[in-house]
Amino acid sequence: MSSYRVLLLTTNSLLAYKKELGMLLVFLLYSYVSFGQSLHLKGKVMDVTNKAPIGYATVAAVGSTTASSTDDEGNFILKVEPNFSKIRISFVGYESQDISIGNETYQELTVYLVPEENTIETVEISAPRRARYSNKNNPAVELIRKVIAHKDENRIASYEYAEYRQYEKVSLGLSNLSEKFKNRKIFKNYQFLFEKEDVETGNSKGYSLPAFIEERLSQVYTRKKPNKTKQLILAEQRAQFDPKFVDNDGLSAYFNKLYQDIDIYESNIELVTNQFLSPIAGASPTFYRFYITDTIKTEIPHLVELSFFPRNKADLLFQGRLYITLDGKYAVKRANLSVADDINLNFVRDLDVKLDFAQDSLQRYYLKTSTLGLDFSLTDKGTGIKGTRTVTFDDFRTGIAQPDSVYAGAPVVKMIAENDTTMDETYWATHRPIALKPNEQNIYRNIDTLQLIPSFQRFMDISALILSGYKQAGPVEIGPVNTFYSFNPVEGFRLRLGGRTTDRLSKRFYAEGYTAYGFKDEKWKYFLSGTYALNNKSVYTFPQHYLRASVMRDTKIPGQNLDFVQEDNFLLSFKRGENERYLYNDIYRLEYKREFESNFSYLLGLSKWRQQPAGILTYQMLDESGNNRLFHELNTTELSVSLRYAPNEEFYQGKLYRTPIYNKYPIFYFNYIAGLKDVLGGEYDYHNFTLGADKRFYFSQLGYADVNIEGNYILGEQIPFPFLNIHRANQTYAYQLQSYNLMNFLEFVSDQSVSANVQYYMNGFILNKIPLIKKLKWREVFSVKAIYGSLRNENNPAYTNEVFQFQKNDDGKPITYGFGSSPYVEASVGLTNIFKFIRVDYVKRLNYLDQPDVPKHGIRVRVKFDF
């Protein structure tokens, strides 16, 4: 595609998902002090009668969901918070034993369990203890397979029609703070925020600092054929931070993405942006160990307690207990899920899920209450951020067919006005199925008070600058700061100053711009755009409907197309190889965009583009005598149409940006660009067609792959190479997902091409199995990028003198080519999650190795924040 297609990127999409994760990391870093270390317990569990080790016994902190299990040799490691004084060891056929623990940070224990006189009787199930675990002839595995076989009839999707009232509450804050931390000078004005915290056992946990709460009340309708769910939001409220500093909508969307709905009947459960294998997935016996640990005859029907543990504690798997009904339905009555301490998961110190099911009028089980607790921390020690999402389901009814009009439109619809004042505390007190805890009740008031304190405003201002790169200045923001200074061979030392308006100036009009100056070429550059929303919403709120006009004069490297990254970013100033072929661009552009609730959108554009070669880039053509004729500028007028369809797409929505959330659904796009000769000074006729698709493929425990497939065709004759498809190259040392990292700028040009890009993330599936290495929590990543194209003779300077000559180096050798008989291919193997945020790839170029000054291999680095 032409080299300027992504030149007019606004800065609204720079950070997106990373911004929300960054906000979380800032709070974690702020709280990271040594005000309470975890207790590390190590020990062995044995049979008191024969001193034989007891494998897969449960070791749990009393009054907590923190638990572990012994290995084949009876050994265990358990990490608990310092306030707990007892642990409980239990195993089927033995009497449970409570052990008191001291305050030492590291403790070793030897525990002897006493066999029960009468082992637990089960209903048609016995659970003899085996020396070594095996799926064969294992009653626990036979039981879980019966649960798997009955999944479809027990899940809510099996109902023809169902409807219920749903209440959601998300709350979080700093937890387990010490008295010393609370009394620090920096918190002198914030004492009203701290709450005394206790656990069920009565042991003091110090102080908590509640920081966020959100509530939502909805009516939900589901039907089986055709499958459809409709959520009508009846009321919602949350603690609001100053919108100058915090994007409340984006923060809410991010927390709701982390604290997702938990469906135990799904094969893969998405949590904290990762997919965990459900203990009742079809493949669960391959990845989990199951044990029958109890029967419960005090409930009707009788229940079996089925304990399960990951075979590999580093994999993305749960551990916990399932309570299965013994009425022939094999439904889940209750479920308690957590994760192992050794799991390859970033920033999550503890994860706890509790699911409770109730029977409906037909004696079938539906989810009654779901609780998800997450404890985030930068390290295993110290305080983190602890949050809980509680969801209750009431007034559950089935068999009531609603008209099609109920299911029409978007799957989630707000039934309340944005500033509805009728949803006051009296309303919530009446409609909440669960009363707020005292510390939760105070959050709404405390956040309002907190924002009146000048020191807190300064802290938020600095945090916003660090995370977004912009400095607040009334109704505008100055930035991004990482573009203030950069350098390149053409401009030399480059200074830039820019900014953008916010919704404090206008919710419908948005402007951004910058000016820059190069001290070597002594030229001014600038960019200015104005966007007006046509649907009385922010221009970045779905569905978008706006008109935008922009003007730009700036430099550009042909073949460097950076999505969502400023090209004068300081870090991108460092490049390998020759890097002196630039363009001066003057672009005037008008755009009209319309999105629909179906996630279909179109973008219409009209642009006038004048480009002048800069540096050592030349535009030259051979005349009839074979002499070079130089061209000092090139002009075109383009009309463009872009179509995009992204079914079931969701966004991290912010004030000045939005970013799509990856899911399993494909994204299709089609772009058409027409060059208009003799229109507004346009000099060429051509038609550029691009068709492509993006999709993420999930492979459960084997990770996931992001795949892009694209085809391009340019129709026209005697088209100079700047208007052909100059393929994306990368001469920086940063690994770029959408570019060819070992291809030089301007190296390959085509007028028809097909390409494929595969990024495969294994989430540590291999490295998690290697002793010692798995302690590093590194993860594997592989990629293959291939592109094949051709260049028709009428557009190839080797066959016609009516187009610009390809570029040559100082020795007169060509450095720009069409493709030969094979595609260009590069592949990489790398490690990600190094220090939790660094990706390093070894990239190898597989062909076209004889072309001058091309790298055959290299190391590339990328920053990637992820859980």
Predicted regions and their residues:
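A short, solvent-exposed beta-strand micro-motif common in secreted/extracellular proteins
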Residues: 83-93
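Structural motif
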Residues: 39-54
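Structured extracytoplasmic
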Residues: 129-303, 309-317, 379-486, 579, ...
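Exposed, low-structure sequence patches enriched in small/polar residues
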Residues: 274-276, 408-867
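Short, acidic Ser/Thr/Gly-rich low-complexity loop/linker segments typical of extracellular
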Residues: 65-75
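Hydrophobic beta-strand segments
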Residues: 57-61, 87, 125, 164, ...
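Short Pro-Gly-centered beta-turn/loop motif in secreted/extracellular proteins
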Residues: 51-55, 77-84
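Short, acidic, small-residue-rich periplasmic hinge/interaction motif at the N-terminus
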Residues: 44-46, 58-60, 91-94, 108-156
